[in-house]
Design a protein with these regions (language model features):
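Acidic, glycine-rich A-domain
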Residues: 1-242
Length: 242
């Protein structure tokens, strides 16, 4: 079956048809729907308990003493934490958004993307010749920023691909906004206090006075990004009871 690949010896369903120069979405990428307005009160309570158990166990797994405890819950396959598949998630919105609007009979949608990190640029499929037998195979490689563009085959729009990894995410967002003009894309980035200054200054100049205000408030609204609204929040602000 051409739609089946293998990862670590296990079969994995391919998420896309593999074509040269297309972006590569990792076949191990999945989105999990933990909470929904379709839950009743009992279902929501049960799911919140499950999430608490999972989060507690993931935290305990990093502590050596916890491995000898008998009351640890088993973490399900594919639930272990890894990288940040932010760009893969943005690509998947091309399928999710129209389905969500149709199922819920919506005209306007607020799409909120919460992340605690960035993602690297997505690779592309590229043919190469095997030096051993001269056979041509389809592999993956990083694009060349100085000569690479993203083209949406449906809209015909093209976007220059940047060198910076965060700029690549902005390109994906611009493409989404071009198609889904009735969707408001809101980004929320949880950032450590140590990285707060570097992160917000990445998107443009901020005076020292404005930075001190943002530091005190532990949040800052970034104007120059691919999101319609983009908020940086220092992680310690999440522990406040106010």
């Amino acid at each position: 079956n051409q739609n089946i690949g293998y990862y670590g010896g296990d079969p994995v369903v391919k998420l896309q048809e593999e074509k040269e120069y297309d972006l590569v979405v990792d076949n191990n990428f999945v989105l999990l729907n933990f909470f929904s307005s379709k839950f009743n009160k009992a279902g929501l309570e049960n799911q919140m308990v499950n999430i608490w158990r999972l989060a507690t166990n993931l935290d305990a797994s990093s502590r050596s003493y916890s491995w000898d405890r008998d009351d640890r819950y088993t973490i399900p396959n594919s639930y272990h934490l890894g990288g940040t598949p932010l760009n893969d998630a943005l690509v998947s919105l091309h399928q999710i958004l129209p389905e969500f609007k149709k199922q819920n009979k919506l005209q306007k949608v607020q799409c909120v993307i919460l992340s605690d990190g960035e993602a690297a640029q997505m690779p592309i499929y590229k043919e190469y010749k095997d030096y051993r037998d001269d056979d041509v195979h389809l592999g993956t490689r990083h694009y060349q920023p100085e000569t690479s563009y993203l083209r949406n085959r449906k809209t015909g729009y093209t976007y220059k691909l940047p060198y910076a990894y965060h700029g690549f995410t902005d390109v994906l967002l611009k493409d989404l906004k071009q198609i889904y003009s009735d969707v408001n894309f809101i980004g929320i980035r949880i950032v450590s206090a140590r990285d707060f200054s570097y992160f917000i200054r990445r998107y443009g100049y901020i005076s020292e006075t404005e930075y001190k205000k943002a530091r005190k408030a532990k949040t800052y609204s970034i104007k120059e990004s691919g999101y319609d609204s983009y908020f940086a929040i220092i992680d310690s602000a999440l522990s406040n009871d106010d």
